[in-house]
């Protein structure tokens, strides 16, 4: 059983509880002290469980249809759309819930968040205050020299109803709530309305939160394989100061995944060093251990703004918004270099990139 409740720790210290509820594993990161069930915890846990039970009951009162919708009813509330990827001819499939179902899902997320369960420290996607850049900073702080990037195959689609339920039963407070008949039914109803055709879809508001939640036990185990491990959704990055044993690490990962639907996408597995190409979540660490965009991204960005400044009128509002977001993101990574490039091409075309990106546009659709 895993416990990651911030509210039951001293804010100046982090605790790990090695024995709680029949000596099952209870996890809290960056441990400095240990307690047993006989000491500090039992008075607080029941109060928190009662609070969680009340929150679930309030959710069913707010949305009585939660327990009435069948799997078929839920599936009918989705619309499937395909978004073109960067690779020509490839698409990302999104399953978008109706406004009615989406409202229920938003309230479900609020209810689950009120339980106070934290995501693992290694998870950086869909977590407020964490980003891809923050994930790479962890590897940078370790002065890592070797990197192993692993991609999970069909991550959201691998999260089936049974897998979600099985994972929740390992995490506090769900491990106890699922033992109580009324609460167990509500949790199963929540899983039901979170899924489309029996799996977590990309495109609804509950999937990102649930994936991080159910990955807590797995992230905990993966975190022990190499000195540094981070996960950004389906992208896992392992690093060390010495060369990583590729076969051994992959075998260990597959052993952790055994009995789960999770699979490694072997086509995207990459091992690299700081002296060569490293592909760390789209960013890189150079020889000086600085986070950089990498040569290829810089080359494409220069070509893009050069073309845009040459004839900005031919760009659609969607393309302008996309370029604006990309520029802001790149500025956060390498502000000095990106500012230099922008000024260079501003002078070349006698225009102002940032003004053009942020000026109000009107289009006829």
Positions of the model-derived regions?
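Right-hand nucleic-acid polymerase module
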Residues: 1-85, 93-150, 155-204, 209, ...
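Conserved recognition-core residues within compact binding domains
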Residues: 89
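Short acidic donor-binding/metal-coordinating loop in glycosyltransferase active sites
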Residues: 152, 233-234
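Short beta-strand
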Residues: 228-232
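Short beta-strand->loop micro-motif that forms the acidic, two-metal-ion catalytic signature
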Residues: 234-241
